[in-house]
Amino acid sequence: KKHPAHRVIAFEKCFMGRTLAVSQITDKHVYRDGLPQTLTVDYIPFYDASNHERSIKMAVSHLEWYFTRYPNQYAAMCMELIQGEGGYWVGNEEYFKAICDVCHKNNVSVIIDEVQTFMRTEEMFAFQYFKLDQHVDIINIGKNSQICATIYKEDHKPRPGLISQTFTSSGSAINSAYYIINEIANNGYLGKEGKINTIHNHFASKLDALNRKYPDKIEGPWGIGAMI
């Protein structure tokens, strides 16, 4: 859709996977050892909850510099809304919306990696938790769903022929995914009073108690939802 644009932007310390392509995006060089370079990737700082305003300004400033330095060369911004390298680090709605606005202003698609976050916050999707419904172009899910899937906005759908049965999961795996998604959606797991938040609050309260007792040994943040 964005050809010949070929560059990608991601967050520092992100993890996107280990395949030949996405290992190029993962911000850890040891995962690329021995692999050929397939993508040109640039990075911006992830959200810093200790300095909200500065964090937004820095991210926007980095993006604007890249888009000025390499005009029309960026195809996508790949985002984890909650990072899982070295603990769980939770982003921020205002921060993400500012980034999405700059990307769309420069014709750069926003891809949300929900392989880790799908069905693990108080909403089905983490992008819904951060109220990014109108800002997202492509979403990837996996892990809890037992199968992987990519969801596109209408104007980002691949043309016929690009995706075939080669990439289709087995019928049993798809049935398992359907059962799990239905269970999470309809049996009290979601919402502020749902099972996922209840479990999180239980563990967070115990971790807070340990923090008070051993402040030099353990400290937050404690993640979000089932990501503790």
Model-found features: residue ranges?
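Conserved N-terminal phosphate-binding loop of PLP-dependent enzymes in the Aspartate aminotransferase
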Residues: K1-I228
